[in-house]
């Protein structure tokens, strides 16, 4: 059987399961006849659920290797949607963005990007609806069939401005399952706080096999919003000419992530991930980091603007965006790690661009990020540039 026929059958299975799921979890906005729920034994199982593990592993591995770009990569997500055994093997094969440089599942948006090369995305701004959409890819395609990653909506309040970040461009409710976090600015628009929404799944884990009646609403899982970063734009009191200057203190990312050797950091992350802990608590490890300062793990990573150079002929400040930015704008920036000279870090770490953002057209901007930032963190930093900052510009 060819790989295309397998993927076609998988799509049919996914659509069938999706129909059952939609009927079971539909809201009470429509009146349905009172019918007896069929027993679980009578529900038809997927014909692919009984495949030998070796064959199943080979099939999913082939799908993972062949479908590397969206929208074709949706086939990998379909494999994880068939049944529990398929989902388990798919999660074993699909590597995290840090290792493969690809975004597959929604959880990938909150995982660090690759170390070697950045993940390239672009942002579309809609002034009429005050929304900002993050897409996966170099630039907008002609078919406009780009993969949507995240969406944000600006909500102005009396003393602050909120940017609600969601997985959907149509639902920005903070009680929705698509809500992933928010960015909040102060009154002057110079200080921002990034909040990461975390769902406590202890209730779901305690009763994994519990099945709800179609008329019974699913229990709402409690959410825990934690601060993962703070962004500060420097005030330009003298109104001098020049680009905006900003600092981003990433509370959830230690400074050791960019100074220690990758093998050491990976070992620490594996040790932390293998240790169970309650949601919201921080796990500490006694593994030593080979740096001059043993407290690097306690210091948050701080990002700062990469210093631009003044171009005499163009009469503007310039940065080397390597062709990813084509329009001069006060919003354009490149962020590098702020590393003290006493830490004896490699010279390339001082110049390594972790996040860059810039304009390429009307209401279109590129966003390229890499380790240790995630797509969610990078997107939150970039949309902070859209807020009005009269006190920061010359």
UniProtKB/Swiss-Prot annotation:
Pfam families: Tub (PF01167). One of its GO terms (biological process) is response to fungus. One of its GO terms (molecular function) is transcription cis-regulatory region binding. Residues 21-44, 200-225, 268-297 are annotated as: Disordered. InterPro entries: F-box-like_dom_sf, Tubby-like_C, Tubby_C, Tubby_C_CS. Ubiquitous. One of its GO terms (cellular component) is nucleus. Residues 46-101 form the F-box domain. Residues 26-44 have a biased composition (Polar residues). Belongs to the TUB family. This is Tubby-like F-box protein 2. It comes from Arabidopsis thaliana. The gene is TULP2.
